[in-house]
């Protein structure tokens, strides 16, 4: 596996606790620096890892020039235009989910990456966390699944939630957009692409999705960031001719999962083989979530 120069775009909590430690420790990465919208945050994170800090338009251009690939830890609507610029400049992409929050922007990013011939990976955690990734790969090799169910009950904004770093885009977009990509990435891994989706809103920020897949299977998802602590948790279950399979208990750390995503990007670069969770997959998730959001708005929900 070749060594790649990778810069980090983003300097918030997610970048601090997941992206930067994984990039700094990876033997196949030369960590080229941290770019942030807030210069002081970029400087603090960069100093912690002994790399240069960048900010502003000129700083982004400098990090781009110094890197073979960029890893993003930004809100989706900030990430998308910067990632499109990076792709057009021939840089490989390690993207956060969702890649964008409107279908046209997601498709434009995917088109730019395809036209430039760059490798890309979207960090949908369950597809890279070793335990869940192995489980999903095993299920995908087996036939006979008729349905699946994914529940992502986050408690970030629950009435009894502990204080957490503010994230305006998550508060605005809610569970559909924040944890929706996780649920869809699990369901699509086993049951295939989606040909029809229906969305219904329950309690505030509780969204239910019903999906019909191209395989003929159906599935459902429940998504929120506002669950009470006692109700918070993640589950995924598939049912078929071989019985019932449920998501393994226990979770790998975010650094371990992101390290696997880095491995996947490096492999895609070396082999010139697209990863299943590339930017086109990310754009497809955005299309599905945008369709669901449109249905909710049309229903006044």
Language model regions located:
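C-terminal helix-rich "cap/oligomerization" subdomain common to oxidoreductases
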Residues: 1, 58-61, 69-71, 214, ...
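Hydrophobic residues in well-ordered beta-strands that form the structural core
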Residues: 15, 55, 95, 120-122
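Contiguous beta-strand/loop segments that form the cofactor/metal-binding neighborhood of enzyme cores
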Residues: 181-248, 263-271
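N-terminal Rossmann-like dinucleotide-binding module
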Residues: 1-49
């Amino acid at each position: 596996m070749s060594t790649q120069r990778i810069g980090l775009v983003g300097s918030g909590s997610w970048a601090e606790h997941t992206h930067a430690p994984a990039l700094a420790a990876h033997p196949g990465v030369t960590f080229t620096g941290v770019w942030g919208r807030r210069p002081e945050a970029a400087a603090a994170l960069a100093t912690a890892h002994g790399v240069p800090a960048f900010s502003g338009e000129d700083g982004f251009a400098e990090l781009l020039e110094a890197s073979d690939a960029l890893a993003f830890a930004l809100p989706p609507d900030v990430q998308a235009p910067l990632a499109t610029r990076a792709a057009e400049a021939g840089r490989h992409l390690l993207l956060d989910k969702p890649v964008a929050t409107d279908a046209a922007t997601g498709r434009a990013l995917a088109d730019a990456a395809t036209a430039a011939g760059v490798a890309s990976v979207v960090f949908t955690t369950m597809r890279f966390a070793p335990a869940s990734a192995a489980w999903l790969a095993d299920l995908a090799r087996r036939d006979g699944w008729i349905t699946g169910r994914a529940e992502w009950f986050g408690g970030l904004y629950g009435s009894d939630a502990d204080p957490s770093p503010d994230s305006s885009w998550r508060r605005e977009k809610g569970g559909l957009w924040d944890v929706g990509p996780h649920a869809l990435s699990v369901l699509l891994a086993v049951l295939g692409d989606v040909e029809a989706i229906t969305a219904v809103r329950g309690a505030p920020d509780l969204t239910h999705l019903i999906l019909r897949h191209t395989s003929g299977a159906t599935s459902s998802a429940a998504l929120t960031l506002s669950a009470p602590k006692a109700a918070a948790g993640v589950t995924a279950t598939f049912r078929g001719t071989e019985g019932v399979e449920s998501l393994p208990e226990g979770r790998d750390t975010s650094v371990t999962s992101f390290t696997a995503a880095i491995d996947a990007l490096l492999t895609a670069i070396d082999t010139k083989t697209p990863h299943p969770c590339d930017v086109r997959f990310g754009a497809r998730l955005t299309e599905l979530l945008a369709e669901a959001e449109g249905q909710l708005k049309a229903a006044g929900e």
